[in-house]
Amino acid sequence: MKVPFNYLNYQFQNKKKYFAEWSKLIDSSEFTLGPYIEKFEKLFAKYIGLKHCISTNNGTDALILSLKSLGVKKGDEVITVCNSFYATAGAIDACGAKIVFVDSDERYQINIDKIEKAITKKTKVILPVHWAGASPNMNKIMKIAKKYKIKVVEDACMGIGAKILKNSPGTFGNVNAFSMHPLKSLNVMGDGGMIGTNDDKIANWLRKYRNHGMVNRDELSMWGVNVRMQPLQTVVANIQLQEVDRIIEKRIKNANFLDKELIKNKNIKIPERIKNYRETFALYMANFKQRDNLKKYLIKNKIEVKIHYPIPLHLQKPSKKVGYKKGDFPIAEKQAKELLTLPVHQYLNIDQLKYMVKKIEDFYK
């Protein structure tokens, strides 16, 4: 039996519903911004619970522009967690600011207890990550930010559809970034991103800056960039937006089954699930003893698994210039040696889940 990690070939089997909408778009010749983009931005804003949403061509640019909209520049410091994807730290570096890492916690989120110790006079922004579709306690983070008069940018790239009590990730910070990469809960056929804010002035700046700084066809208000989302992608996004909650509920059901079965095994540590927090399970991660050998065993048995990630950000080559070294963040470093990501997507059936659990149990016998 095969248990695939990637599910995109299943998602796009029903091509007719996409082709019908693409045909309308082609007939309209609206290939740059226009009504298709505006429609998706409004629908997404309503779904998340924000006043303004500004689409971009990917989540990385959404992060960069979010930081730039708050004036982050050379000489500033931005605090973030050291166990995220490269784009989180890369966006800070792209603005010329210094990356200040803090450790993760046992749920793989930013360790809130470490944030205040990392704050200096140069700290401009706290950048928490909603890692793997789970969330840190954003209310606590916002209290710290308010205390020190620091801005917050949420990396909610994996947080679409999640909930912190009744609120969505990406609605707490000043400006927040989302991703619609193919392996996200809400995705497009390629890359896509979104920036969300309730600030009218910031939203106006972002709309101009992401489109060369144009006021209209003949006038510029600033030098900007071109990071526009393509209208072709909104066709996929609008269809997926109608289905995203159903997709997430199926992933939650699969994750709950894995939790129930794997928590019995003393060789496996499942992260705490917080009451009244809805996780999207963009990734299903746990700590496994003998992780590397288990990974080989599962792959041999046709179960595709991944590691997110074997080298934390502070130990990556670009971090050497900042002066980080092994031992600086022990929790994240331990997790990098033990974490394994199992398939949990909405197209898995119960037999595949049971097979995966059995093979994990067989390995530890």
Regions found by a protein language model. Give the residues of each.
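Short, well-ordered alpha-helices that flank and scaffold nucleotide-derived cofactor binding pockets
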Residues: 64, 68, 90, 117, ...
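PLP-dependent aminotransferase-like
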Residues: 68-156, 163
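Phosphate-binding glycine-rich loop
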Residues: 30-77, 91-95, 101, 167
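Short beta-strand-to-turn element immediately C-terminal to the catalytic PLP-Schiff-base lysine
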Residues: 178-179, 193-198, 238
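Structural detector of well-ordered beta-strand residues that form the stable sheet scaffold
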Residues: 54, 79, 100, 152-153, ...
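N-terminal "arm"/small-domain region of PLP-dependent enzymes with the aminotransferase-like
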Residues: 1-30, 35, 343
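Conserved active-site segment immediately N-terminal to the catalytic lysine
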Residues: 154-189, 216-221
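PLP-dependent aminotransferase class I/II
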Residues: 8-9, 20, 36-43, 47-53, ...
